[in-house]
Amino acid sequence: MGKGASNKKVLERVPITKPPFEYNDLKKAVPPHCFSRPLFRSFYFLLHDIIVTCILFYVASNYIPMLPGFLSYIVWPVYWISQGVFLGRLWMIGHECGHHSFSNYRWVDDSVGFLIHTATLTPYFSFKYSHRNHHAHTNSMEYDEVHIPKRKSEALDLYFEFLGNNPMGLMITMLCKLTFGYAAYIMFNYTGKKHKSGGLASHFYPQSPLFNDSERNHVLFSDVGICIVLYACYRIVMVTGAMSAFYVYGIPWVIMSAILFAATYLQHTHPSIPHYDTTEWNWLRGALSTIDRDLGFFNMNKTHYHVIHHLFPVIPEYHAQEATEAIKPILGQYYKYDGTPFLKALWREMKDCIYVESDQGQKKQGIYWFKNKI
């Protein structure tokens, strides 16, 4: 009974009334040192993850192929998951650089972020610019940049009838999204907003409607970096063979992509948090319509403490927990945390959060909640 009551509480909707606090109240509650981002400490975490990643690459390239067949079947998956997690950790540091939360020097942040994201086949400046728009319009039905839910009218099609509303269909959907979702977002803006101006909404296309004129040269620069890495991958394949390169880098990259897609999906998808159209949305409402999760396998505070990240993206991940604890008493019911295990939460959200619509009889029709009844 206790567990059922706890689950019910987790799914209780957050209040939609005006919060009894202001943004400045939250900022004053955060200890000032949480906004500091010392260069030495940030580089310590960066070098730690780079060293572990390099060691894993070295072991996978030189020792795992020498193992007996039966043993390699066990060790390879352990390597893939471990390396995928550490590539994801490096990617998150690059993401921090885009928020200027790595150091006090923007040129350092952009240099480090560019190198890290390029190595993980992410166009740094392109993602930085589109992600900035996500933070500026979080949970806006019209203007958010990623994981925009479908309205009920859009969900009434064959895809949702046959894939989204039965266990086998949900499993196929989940596997496809985890495998291809991140790459599809970067290449084709999958789950992103529809741009009225038309054009290819790709992070690789400088003329994409995702960017303004002042950003296009940086997008092109990001593309050049990606091309260099792809050429390096090609040269490695020529030396080691396609299968070896796929085992050592390709599969861990897919694992990293799955982690990133799942983490961001879960941070913005939950039965208890609303989305808003232009009649109801404001920045604070959007920032509070995110949810903290316990994605322990990822071991990165930006994945655990996402609410504080949207309120104060300049806070580095190693201060996120302390800053969160400082504002929780002020947030009260406006703060949402769900400790449901990762795979269970992912399955539940994909099953229960198929589309959004306003409640019948609801006075404010610009507030949308996740539902699953087709």
UniProtKB/Swiss-Prot annotation:
Q: In which pathway does it act?
A: Lipid metabolism; polyunsaturated fatty acid biosynthesis
Q: Where is this motif: Histidine box-3?
A: 306-310
Chain span(s) of sequence motif Histidine box-1: 95-99
Q: Which organs or tissues contain this protein?
A: Expressed exclusively in the developing seeds. Not detected in leaves or flower buds.
Transmembrane annotation, as ranges: 50-70, 74-94, 168-188, 219-239, 246-266
EC number(s) on file: 1.14.19.14
Q: Give the motif span (Histidine box-2).
A: 131-135
Task: Give UniProt keywords alphabetically.
Answer: Endoplasmic reticulum, Fatty acid biosynthesis, Fatty acid metabolism, Lipid biosynthesis, Lipid metabolism, Membrane, Microsome, Oxidoreductase, Transmembrane, Transmembrane helix
**Which GO biological process categories is it annotated with?**
alpha-linolenic acid metabolic process; unsaturated fatty acid biosynthetic process
InterPro entries in the record, alphabetically? FA_desaturase_dom (IPR005804), Fatty_acid_desaturase (IPR012171)
Lipid bilayer topology: Multi-pass membrane protein
Gene Ontology CC: endoplasmic reticulum; membrane
Care to name a GO molecular-function term for this sequence? oxidoreductase activity, acting on paired donors, with oxidation of a pair of donors resulting in the reduction of molecular oxygen to two molecules of water
Print the domain comment field. The histidine box domains may contain the active site and/or be involved in metal ion binding.
Family according to the record: Belongs to the fatty acid desaturase type 1 family.
General function of this protein: Fatty acid conjugase converting 18:2(9Z, 12Z) to calendic acid 18:3(8E, 10E, 12Z). Converts alpha-linolenic acid (18:3(9Z, 12Z, 15Z)) into 18:4(8E, 10E, 12Z, 15Z). Also has weak activity on the mono-unsaturates 16:1(9Z) and 18:1(9Z) producing two conjugated double bonds at delta(8) and delta(10) position.
Q: What is this protein called?
A: Fatty acid conjugase FAC2 A
